[in-house]
Amino acid sequence: MTTQGKIRLGVPVVEMGQGIYTSLAMCVVEELEMTLDQVEHIETVFHTAFANPVLSYFTNDKLRIQMTGGSTSLMGWGAYYQEIGATAREMIINAAAYKWNEKPHFLKINGSKVVNQVTGATLSYGELSEQAGQISIPQKPKIKKISKFKVIGKPLKRWETLSKINGTASFGADLDLPGILYGTIKHSPILG
């Protein structure tokens, strides 16, 4: 989370038209009571930590690879991203509690702010982001009940669509590294 209160969200799967960037962002903003326009997607590095959870599960961890396909992205990552949002929410609330010297149960979140229900004071997520980064990570954050959902399950515009339309979206073919060499087939050796 930035000091402007935006989320930089890494997604370890490829957006191929299935809407996964939006879906996983929805899982996080649901828990934080934010909006999709407060999310910025960033690329993740290749690492076994980002192995496809569904594929790993069904192969007893024999195939721990980072892969997109088979409709496994949301099934595999959705609950993890909700937990990321819930963890961030609890850390932000705890940062506000520390700043106000107040018990966390007297605080609530509302529109990217923490509200002190005793004094009425508010602090934005941006104001709390650095302090929240110093808070111990909760081991079992409380996930919202389905009945409380405001984002998940609701029709929303996909937040990455504009970048695809205006050409600013980044794809694998856009990779540019210092000294990179590109290769292509000049002419296919066979017809068809």
Where in the sequence are the language-model features?
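Cofactor-binding beta-sheet edge motifs in enzyme active sites
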Residues: M1-G192
